[in-house]
Design a protein with these regions (language model features):
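Acidic-glycine-rich active-site phosphate/pyrophosphate-binding loop
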Residues: 253-274
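Phosphate-binding loop of NTP-binding sites
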Residues: 19-22, 43, 56-60, 69, ...
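Generic beta-sheet signal
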Residues: 30, 52, 91, 135, ...
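Generic structural signal for helix capping and beta-alpha/helix-loop junctions
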Residues: 37, 59, 98, 142-143, ...
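Short, polar loop motifs at secondary-structure junctions
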Residues: 32-35, 53-55, 71-73, 221-225, ...
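Beta-strand->loop->alpha-helix junctions that form or flank phosphate-binding loops
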Residues: 50-53, 91-96, 135-138, 233-256, ...
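ATP-dependent carboxylate-amine ligase
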Residues: 1-34, 43-49, 61, 65, ...
Length: 458
């Protein structure tokens, strides 16, 4: 079967393309902007990429068009597809019907940490010999690829709450029918499609309703937004984690930066049943919590705690999640996907705990739909307190005046609207013992590579 994917370079759709290819289909696809790392991964796997949406790419007609959720009415390919009655479906529906139907699905949902937690869980299952399939919205460096079919009944999927397609406004994760579900956290996001937090909680409760009675739902005990979802009704076994005395699953920090910690599983009387210690290269309390959730999920399919902790101690990480892309002469540049104030805050706090008094420069492109609308502008100022200085990139798509940010931020701050000026300002600050954290959920107009080259030439 020839499958053509519209919006193929998105993290989800690109991963879907790999699964379709590995399942024996001929796969091609197109997108408005084709950029690494996804474009590189697709090309390496023999998947034809077309830049732009000229309808000629649909001649001769493929057997099926898989439509990404970034596609809308008015797109030339979408209009041609509809006018010519080409068979089509959404990415999540194709995944659920063709890949996940006969699997034990371990799904990772929540506002933050989905990609990292999914990668941790896949790493644990792989190290334990379970050879899982997976689809992850990023590229786990431990696996080297964002998706594979696997050789067992287990499948790890990053479960996104964004809508499925222009013709299916349900959240993607409704299509996955999870057996083991992690809900890491829950906050307001995606203001372009959700009116308020309650609208998101409604979708999450729909997700909870799809988990079988014999299934498992894993969540932090202290997240009130999740607790409100569960209060609407839950028919599955719940596993709560945190640091409360009555939490059966707990973490205990050995190092403040989260580079060493313990995981303890106790019975209802507080007697330890299993425990393990993680010593790894990651940092930040958010990653400790991600790890704990992954360990609990793995436990549900037979992996003991010490095995999981041993696997996580070798966890490398995920591309674009505090990925070191340049390191020389005291300058370290990180590429990070953070695009929400909570994620920005936890990432910078983790780095601060790790590097001590070294200079941290945060460079932030408010690129997500929610950020461009200015929904989070009240909390952005406090999210960067752990940095020493912040540079904001205000491109033409941002709908609000970012000047007010500078007044509210306690650290030195600049708002820059030209990429060349941003490179110049960053190079000026690139002295010894500086950590430059680039935060964007897009290609950032090639800024990462241009900056690295500029610093190399000093």
């Amino acid at each position: 079967m020839h499958i053509h994917i519209l919006g193929i370079c998105g993290t989800f759709m690109g991963s879907l393309a790999l699964l379709a290819k590995h399942a024996g289909h001929q796969v091609s696809g197109s997108d408005a902007n084709v950029y690494p790392p996804m474009s590189t991964q697709l090309e390496e796997n023999g998947i034809q990429l077309i830049e732009g949406f000229d309808p000629e790419q649909l001649k001769p007609a493929p057997d099926l068009v898989v439509v990404g959720n970034a596609m809308s009415r008015g797109n030339p390919c979408v209009e041609y597809m509809l006018d010519n009655s080409l068979p089509y479906t959404s990415g999540p529906q194709w995944l659920g019907e063709n890949i996940l139907r006969d699997k034990h699905v371990l799904a990772v949902a929540g506002t933050h940490g989905k990609t990292t937690t999914s990668s941790m869980l896949a790493k644990i299952l792989e190290t334990s010999g379970l050879s899982p399939g997976f689809l992850i919205g990023g590229i786990p460096q431990d696996m080297g690829i964002s998706a594979r079919l696997g050789d067992s009944k287990y499948f790890v999927v990053e479960a996104d709450e964004y809508d499925s397609a222009f013709f299916d406004k349900r959240s993607k994760f409704i299509h996955y029918f999870s057996n083991t579900l992690i809900i890491n956290n829950l906050e307001f996001d995606h203001a372009d499609i959700f009116e308020d937090l309650g609208a998101i909680q409604k979708q999450f409760h729909h997700l909870v309703r799809t988990v079988p009675g014999a299934g498992n739902i894993i969540m932090p005990s202290s997240d009130e937004n999740i607790n409100q979802v569960m209060a609407q009704g839950c028919w599955s076994c719940q596993h709560q984690f945190g640091i409360k005395p009555d939490d059966n699953w707990q973490y205990r920090l050995i190092e403040e930066d989260g580079s060493r910690f313990e995981i303890i599983f106790s019975d209802d009387q507080g007697v330890t049943k299993e425990s393990g210690r993680v010593v790894w290269s990651q940092s930040g309390l958010h990653n400790v919590k991600n790890a704990l959730a992954a360990v609990i999920a793995a436990y549900q399919v037979g992996v003991n705690v010490s095995q999981s902790c041993e696997a996580l101690s070798d966890f490398i990480g995920v591309k674009r999640r505090m990925e070191v892309i340049y390191e020389s002469q005291g300058v370290t540049i990180y590429d990070d996907f953070a695009h929400h104030p909570t994620a920005i805050k936890s990432t910078l706090e983790g780095l601060r705990a790790k590097v001590g008094d070294d200079f941290i420069l945060a460079i932030i492109e408010p690129r997500s739909a929610t950020m461009k609308m200015g929904v989070h502008q009240q909390t952005l100022a406090s999210s960067v307190k752990s940095a020493d200085q912040v540079l904001w990139y205000q491109n033409a798509a941002i709908d609000w005046d970012m000047a007010s940010l500078s007044d509210a931020i306690e650290i030195p701050s600049m708002i820059i609207n030209k990429l060349d000026d941003l490179i110049e300002a960053t190079v000026h600050l690139a002295h010894s013992n500086v950590h430059i954290v680039i935060m964007s959920n897009g290609g950032f107009e090639g800024f990462h590579k241009k900056l690295s080259n500029a610093i190399k030439s000093l």
